[in-house]
Amino acid sequence: METANYTKVTEFVLTGLSQTREVQLVLFVIFLSFYLFILPGNILIICTIRLDPHLTSPMYFLLANLALLDIWYSSITAPKMLIDFFVERKIISFGGCIAQLFFLHFVGASEMFLLTVMAYDRYAAICRPLHYATIMNRRLCCILVALSWMGGFIHSIIQVALIVRLPFCGPNELDSYFCDITQVVRIACANTFPEELVMICSSGLISVVCFIALLMSYAFLLALLKKHSGSGENTNRAMSTCYSHITIVVLMFGPSIYIYARPFDSFSLDKVVSVFHTVIFPLLNPIIYTLRNKEVKAAMRKVVTKYILCEEK
């Protein structure tokens, strides 16, 4: 890449979601409500799984890790977005932008890999029930979770490494409420086609391949379960769990594919999809998993009664 005497950009200006004051106040109330549900909701999931002796299966261990990632993921953009609703000029430093990029892709990719691990867990539980405890032992679960985090870290490092080598000489306005690669690449003062191609292959291709693989695996499991649909409550519970996982997979991978598996051009739906991806999706995880899982709901009631209500008395 050619070097020149560029005026180095030290900060980026975010356009936000709306310029209308009334709309900003409404959005602030809505997103603050979401965030205040995401944090305690996922913390309650983690505490319930940690404290209840009956929730010791690998599925709940993975669910606790998913809840932790949701807390982290929502906290990357939500706090600054909420503050920016009351700021006339929404600014983020270059370093802050790079940090936001890194953690978004680190946590987001880790969550995708973790969902893949959860699909393998369901496969072992349904197809190899007699050997499930041996196959999905705690040691293997810890290794798979660690590999998910490591995969997310490597993916994020690649994305950030491609961004920091680009020159930025102005303009410095990002048509978004947070720093994302698709926006930052667009304002670089250089030909970014090679970088875009690598990013699309890294983010977009991974999303598409994982999404197709996950849908195929769950379709196979559901077809297998439907053959034994009259065999009892355990089969119905397994089908319910699979439907929950499929819902999460679609909600996670759909927006990601829309954003990253195409050229980084601007479209009218970009902000809406980004809001769904960064704010609404972490909200749906605890709702879907708790509402469709009787064991988790019962355990949550016990934890709330024992550790919260009793202390208040």
Curated annotation (Swiss-Prot):
It holds the Pfam family 7tm_4. Its main location: membrane. Keywords: Cell membrane, Disulfide bond, G-protein coupled receptor, Glycoprotein, Membrane, Olfaction, Receptor, Sensory transduction, Transducer, Transmembrane, Transmembrane helix. The chain crosses the membrane at residues 26-49, 58-79, 101-120, 140-158, 196-219, 238-260, 272-291. The keyword S-adenosyl-L-methionine does not apply. CDD domains: 7tmA_OR4N-like (cd15937). Disulfide bonds join 97-189. Olfactory receptor that acts as a receptor of Asprosin hormone, potentially at the surface of hepatocytes and may help to promote hepatocyte glucose release. The human olfactory receptor 4M1 (Q8NGD0) is not the one to one ortholog of mouse Or4m1 (Q8VFT4). This is Olfactory receptor 4M1.
